[in-house]
């Protein structure tokens, strides 16, 4: 699968991963800013932006697999990775599976499981997913809602395996 991406600058690779339903364009200002010191690569994940959907179900693990293949195809052995929302979940799963490929990790609004969301947003995601699933019988049309309602599933104990510098950002009013 060939993922679409925006690339600017040179130097140490910095990969930016957007959230559910967004695209690399989400990071337009960050690409411009960080490209003064980094080789910035903002990726459209599978089925987002201009990247094809591909086959099989959407899972955070599949997105992490896609990132590994993308890095190999781009000739990137190791990169700093910044993820926002579901992009942070993908970055975290990637770092847990291939820690040697991550220099530094920045997680903005990540969650270990859907249970990490506040009650009302979690309920909203679950209800929208169930409603979409009942109305639309095509699983490909409900998969973004499924990501929000049912993923990721990261065991808190796994976090102790991270050895790279990690910056976690979360806001008081995050969902």
Label the model's feature ranges.
Residues 6-50:
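Conserved HGGG/HGGXW glycine-rich cap/lid loop of the alpha/beta-hydrolase fold
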Residues 13, 37-39, 77-80, 101-104:
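Structural signature of beta-strand start/N-cap positions in the alpha/beta core
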Residues 15, 41-43, 84, 108, ...:
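The conserved SAM/SAH-binding core of class I Rossmann-like methyltransferase domains
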Residues 18-20, 79, 83-88:
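Conserved alpha/beta-hydrolase "nucleophile elbow" surrounding the catalytic nucleophile
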Residues 28, 32, 41-82:
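Active-site loop/oxyanion-hole signature of alpha/beta-hydrolase fold enzymes
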Residues 89-97, 103-131:
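Flexible "cap/lid" loop of the alpha/beta hydrolase fold
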Residues 143-158, 175:
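Active-site nucleophile elbow and catalytic-triad environment of alpha/beta-hydrolase enzymes
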Residues 162, 168-170:
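Short beta-strand/loop motif that positions the catalytic acidic residue
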């Amino acid at each position: 699968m060939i993922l679409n991406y925006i690339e600017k600058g040179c130097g140490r690779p910095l990969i930016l991963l957007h959230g559910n339903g967004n695209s690399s364009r989400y990071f337009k200002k960050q690409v411009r800013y960080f490209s003064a010191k980094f080789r910035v690569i903002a990726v459209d994940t599978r089925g987002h932006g201009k990247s094809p959907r591909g086959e099989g179900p959407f899972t955070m693990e599949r997105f992490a697999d896609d990132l590994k293949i993308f890095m190999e195809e781009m000739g990137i052995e190791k990169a700093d990775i910044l993820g926002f929302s579901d992009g942070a979940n993908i970055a975290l799963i990637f770092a847990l599976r291939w820690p040697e490929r991550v220099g530094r990790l920045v997680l903005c609004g990540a969650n270990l499981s859907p249970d990490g969301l506040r009650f009302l947003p979690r309920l909203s995601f679950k209800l929208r997913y169930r409603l979409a699933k009942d109305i639309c019988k095509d699983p490909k049309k409900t998969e973004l809602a499924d990501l929000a309602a049912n993923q990721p599933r990261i065991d808190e104990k796994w976090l102790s395996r991270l050895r790279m510098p990690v910056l976690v950002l979360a806001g008081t009013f995050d969902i």
